[in-house]
Amino acid sequence: NAYKNVTVYGVNDNLTDGNQTFSVIIEGDNQTLDSKYNSLDVDDIFVVNVDDDTPGFTITPISGPTSEDGGTATFTFKVNTVPDDLDSSTNNDNVTINISSSDITEGTVYPSQLVFTKSNWNSENQITVTGVDDNVSDGNQSYSIILDVDNSTTAVGYSILNPSDVNLYNVDSDSPGYYVSSVSGDTDEMA
C-alpha cells in the first residue's frame, strides 16, 4: 500500500508558444504477478508545462566609435527565442531585421539585413559600422544604427517589438585651416 512518486520534468523548447498541457499516460503492466492488476485502467494525469520563453533581442555593446579615416566598430545581435508563427501549414517562421545608419555621411553599416530562422536563431550575428570622412571640420558627430523588425516577420511576438538602436559617434579627422603655396619668381612694383 505504499505510494510511489513519479517526477515529471518540463522541457524547454525555446518557443514562445504559451503554457502547454500534456498528459502522463499510466498503463497497467500485463506482466505483473498479481492478476488483479493486469491491464488495470488508470486515469491519465494532465500536466501544464509553463512557458518561460519571451521574444526579444540580445544586442552587445558597440566596440567603440568609428573614425573618419575608415575606422570600424562592431556589435552583435541575436533573437532570444526560436521564430515560430505557430501555423504548421506555413513555412514563414522568420524574424527579419533591417539595419541602417541614421547618417550615411558619418557611418555606413554592413549587413543591411539579418534573417533569423529556426535553424540559426541562436547565432550571434556581427554588425560592422564603418566611419565616413565628410571632409568637414565638424568635430566628433553622433549618429545611430537603426534596427527595425521587417513587416514580413510573422513569428509570434516579434512583429510588435522594436529593438533598441545603437548609438555611437564618428571621430573627426579634419582640422580647420588654409594652405599657402609659395609663389615662384619675383614680383615687380611696376606691374
Per-segment meaning from a language model:
Residues 1-191:
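Short boundary segments that mark the start of a structured unit
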